[in-house]
Amino acid sequence: GFAIWFGFVPLIHIWLNQTKKESARLTFLSAIISNTIAFYWIGLNSGASFIPVFLSLTGAVLYLSFLLAIFGWIISWFEIKRRGIALIIIPFLWVTMEWLRSFGPLGFPWANLAITQTKFLPIIQIIDFTGSEGIGFWIMILNTYIYYLIINNSVNKKIITLFIIFIIPWIYGTLRIDQLNDKEWEFRTVAAIQPNINPNQKWEPTYRKTLISIMDSLNNEAYNMKPKLVLWPEAALPVYMRVSSIKQVYEKKVYESNIPLIMGTVDFKRDKVDRKVFNGSIYFGLNENKIYHKLLLVPFAEYIPLSEKFSFLKQLNFGQANFSHGSEFTTFPLDSIYFSNIICYESSHPSIARGFINNGARFLTIQANDAWLQNSSGVRQHFELARLRAIEFRTGIIRSANTGISGIIDPTGLIKHKVNFSDQEVFQGDVLLNKGLTFYASFGNLFSQLCFVLILLQGAFILISKK
């Protein structure tokens, strides 16, 4: 929200006036508090036992807080080495930190500051150029300039400059939204299902017939709307749909109606060594079926990091699923175009959406199951991430959650339809097609990379000049 526009001012004071060690320590303590508040919902996972859930929450909070402590240490180092420079480099180093934090098996761009600004739609329009890190850059410029005005006792003299810094993204974003709204957009009409099924009950053998009956009833309702595509949520039925006998029911439905269907399903492959299981989706197309295997898995929930290289790690039991990673940015044919499907946690990583868009997807579907998180802020955060992806790639998105928040989002990030947590609903709407590659789709995190290079050059300059 708006508090973050000035909320870093006390920390900036610490970074610029404490030793490196004390700066890191105080940053770590403050980050423990803020990260616990932001991500407490990790500890609400009803799909696992208490110990692994508690360890997941603790590990995530400590990891994110440690990274911020390093940030505080580096800022203090710059200030000690060359007084006055640290205040200038804070926005650039923040972008660098957010970008580097997205890499590796523990990458977590979910924590980027952009997610705090989705209520202010004009502000976040710049991310089709900068990526979500651009919002963190603007927030840090605001905070550093406010701090500068306070310590120099010049708030009254330079308030106009502060106002200009504040208002620029609002003006740009408002004009950009108006420009996009004036354009003619192609679209495809898609129907989606939010069945609101208890995920623990879903896998009980005694509930299987009831579940199939519920899903078939909702599916018939969706087909009666005569869309171009029907979307089901993640892991919709407790079967390996690709090899299940009930697959024929849905193939027949697609054939008779001439309307494709995409549903979440688990899948498997056998090779000479072992049997690999995937979280994925199956597309019942008009000419063929097609499978997508989830590329980005949730660490310690869907797999153990590095377990695909070191198989003995799979013997560890934290209640995780031991899925394998997919390997292809799959696109699905829909009349004359292609679209792609993102599964749950993947929507937090722009690199996944970018891979699909660059592979020819004209719009994105998202399948999710947020029931594990109960009705927490994590559910709402997860939906807001989809709005960021829509803006970054100027593409329409439709989201189907088992329960959570389902909906339709347009290329400006505007929510066109929304289904609340615990509601059961079948809905239909027009999903807008992207008009081509945005700057961010074409060049990726160029802005973040430039910030990283500037930090390296400044650090190198200080080290060389001291010698």
What are these regions (language model features)?
Residues 178-443:
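Soluble catalytic domains of enzymes that build or remodel membrane lipids, polysaccharides, and related
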